[in-house]
């Protein structure tokens, strides 16, 4: 990913756009055809470009000055009718399209690892949590199936963002093609694999760029959510999973026992930066009239950084999921913690099915559950003592309501929906 945004790679893109524009003009008879091979001998010298920029204070003019020096009279065929943003915005579109391709490969790799782990953990029972509290049983595989579904949407989201940003422009100072034949624009964009912006000003409208970084921020948010779950699962009181931890890795300078979920914490922290970069792109939409330059300084930071950070996050999350250690015994113990209160809804529904008013049934089950929690008793034993329950449910019927596997009876449908069956 970093290679896409290296200064030399950027300058090479600028040069290719300038050369293609000259070729386009040559096809129209406006530039001598025999000049094109000579122009193609142009090279980029980042050090020379930097030196010139320090003098002229304009990166594109410094670039043109540097590449023109060995070209002699042929240099006049470069930048014909163009404005700086014709080159800069079109090059940025190529860079972001390539960056999206890297991110899509990353997403495909993470998707495959999550798919494999979801398949393996389909029947691994654990407790589901809402508001941070025990709710009802589910399986780790079911949770991972949700991640898989979300990653599918992430891939589609990046694909849409890629398509929207895959747009170039060579339309001149305010976008009217007064100095650039539209056929030159079409030729250059086609050779670069870009669509032509239907309408542009001096720049490509920044709603496209805002949407691109917003898409990256949403993907980062998904990884943030996954990593947050892992962090809680690894907490000492829960201890259901563990991140990969190297043989020589250390968790604390003071406490040798520490095995912290630092990889997941890192992902959560980096997600905040990507969200911040997206906000910058949203702020950059409101340029003055046909263009000002307030967006430029910010974009030079946020686009390379956001792409590289998300690339790293995706590869790191792939490493975490692939190497995640699952403690199934601890999951089972946690599931039964609280004396079986996670089965309260099944008792409620059974009482209603046997003729009890729903609100009455709710209150009976609620009192029994809270008593079990407060007194450290087994919910199953407390609810069995309630006279209203004994009147309607036999001990055998009540016993069947405390089977964790019951909650997985329709997981197959979910797996089929996400393509796991």
Model feature map: region roles:
Residues 185-278:
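Acidic, glycine-rich loop-and-beta core segments that form the ion-binding/anion-interacting portion
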Residues 142, 210-218, 346-354:
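Short, well-ordered beta-strand elements within core beta-sheets of diverse protein domains
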Residues 26, 30, 115, 119, ...:
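Hydrophobic/aromatic-lined pockets within catalytic cores
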Residues 1-13, 17, 37, 41, ...:
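Glycine-rich cofactor/substrate-binding loops
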Residues 97-108, 115, 145-148, 152, ...:
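Short amphipathic alpha-helical segments with heptad-repeat character
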Residues 1-171, 177, 181-187, 196, ...:
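A helix-coil-helix interface module used to build multimeric assemblies
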Residues 31, 36, 238-239, 357:
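Conserved hydrophobic residue
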Residues 84, 176, 191, 196-203, ...:
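A structural signal for small-residue-enriched, beta-sheet-centric alpha/beta enzyme cores
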């Amino acid at each position: 990913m970093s290679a896409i945004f290296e200064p030399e790679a950027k300058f090479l893109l600028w040069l290719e756009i300038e050369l293609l524009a000259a070729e386009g003009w040559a096809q129209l008879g406006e530039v001598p055809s025999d000049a094109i091979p000579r122009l193609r001998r142009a090279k980029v010298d980042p050090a020379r470009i930097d030196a010139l920029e320090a003098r002229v204070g304009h990166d594109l003019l410094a670039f043109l000055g540097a590449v023109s020096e060995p070209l002699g009279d042929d240099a006049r065929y470069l930048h014909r009718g163009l404005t700086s943003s014709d080159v800069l915005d079109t090059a940025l579109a190529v860079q972001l399209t390539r960056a999206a391709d890297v991110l899509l490969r990353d997403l495909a790799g993470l998707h495959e690892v999550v798919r494999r782990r979801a398949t393996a953990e389909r029947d691994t029972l654990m407790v589901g949590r809402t508001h941070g509290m025990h709710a009802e049983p589910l399986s780790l595989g079911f949770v991972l199936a949700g991640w898989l579904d979300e990653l599918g949407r992430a891939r589609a989201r990046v694909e849409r963002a890629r398509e929207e940003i895959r747009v170039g422009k060579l339309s001149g100072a305010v976008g009217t093609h007064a100095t650039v034949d539209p056929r030159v624009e079409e030729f250059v964009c086609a050779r670069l694999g870009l669509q032509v912006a239907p309408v542009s000003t001096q720049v490509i409208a920044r709603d496209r760029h805002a949407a691109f970084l917003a898409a990256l921020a949403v993907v980062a948010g998904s990884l943030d959510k996954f990593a947050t779950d892992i962090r809680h699962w690894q907490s000492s009181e829960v201890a259901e999973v563990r991140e990969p931890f190297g043989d020589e890795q250390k968790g604390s300078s003071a406490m040798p026992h520490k095995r912290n979920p630092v990889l997941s914490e890192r992902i959560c922290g980096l997600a905040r930066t990507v969200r911040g970069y997206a906000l910058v792109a949203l702020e950059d939409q409101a340029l003055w009239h046909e263009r000002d330059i307030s967006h430029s300084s910010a974009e030079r930071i946020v686009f390379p950084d956001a792409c590289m950070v998300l690339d790293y996050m995706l590869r790191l999350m792939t490493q975490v999921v692939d190497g995640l250690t699952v403690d199934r015994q601890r999951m089972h113990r946690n599931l039964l913690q609280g004396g079986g209160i996670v089965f309260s809804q099944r008792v409620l529904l059974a009482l209603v099915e046997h003729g009890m008013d729903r609100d009455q049934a709710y209150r009976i089950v609620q009192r029994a559950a809270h008593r079990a929690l407060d007194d450290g008793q087994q919910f199953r034993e407390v609810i069995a003592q309630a006279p209203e329950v004994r009147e309607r449910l036999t001990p055998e019927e009540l016993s069947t309501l405390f089977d964790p596997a019951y909650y997985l009876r329709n997981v197959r449908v979910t797996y089929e929906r996400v393509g796991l069956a």
